[in-house]
Amino acid sequence: KRIKDIRWYEDKVKAKPRGNAYVIGNGPSRKGFDLKKLEATGQTYGCNALYRDFMPDFIFSVDTKMSMQMVEDEVGLKTAHYGPALEVNRKQSKGMIHLIPHNPHWISGNAAFWTAGVHGHQNIYLLGFDFREYGKGELNNIYQGTDCYGERDDDKIFEGWLKQFRDMLKMRPYVNYTVVHDNPPEYLNHLQTGTDLGNSRVVSYAEFEKVLAPS
């Protein structure tokens, strides 16, 4: 039996956009970059275990195990923690998780850049977004093998993340999305599908540094 939850949830975060939106994924391509550099010129959005090393302005989780670990660590008392209704409504959540606005039911990292757009940001930068897994034995996530993540032990390649991003480009043609990557794989050169809306690009970290410290 399928159940549809149609309850109304008050927006207790009441976020207002400030500067750029910096959305931090946990892909290996951002390893070594100092995330504290982002704080002066915008708002930071992140997901899952990022809080262990850096506390963004907004953080997202959709997995129960990860969400409950974040509640135990009281992440929601330190920043705005977003999740789906299933996690918001758990008694164990202790009111620390806010509902993802107009939830598209995407993975946590993609829910982060979705919400940056809902908050009104029109210039969104994505760091650590590699948009796919690389197979057994490969590093796919900075936190791979740690609590709530486990090992990468199969050869399955999942590309749904990239499709969700391409869908986002079509849904919000008035928002500019910039992927920051020093060694972009070929598929990052083909972010647009169908008509090129001109609202996506890929830049290196050296180019991105100029955004953070404009002359």
Language-model region placement:
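Metal-ion/cofactor- or nucleotide/acyl-coenzyme-handling active-site neighborhoods
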Residues: 1-215
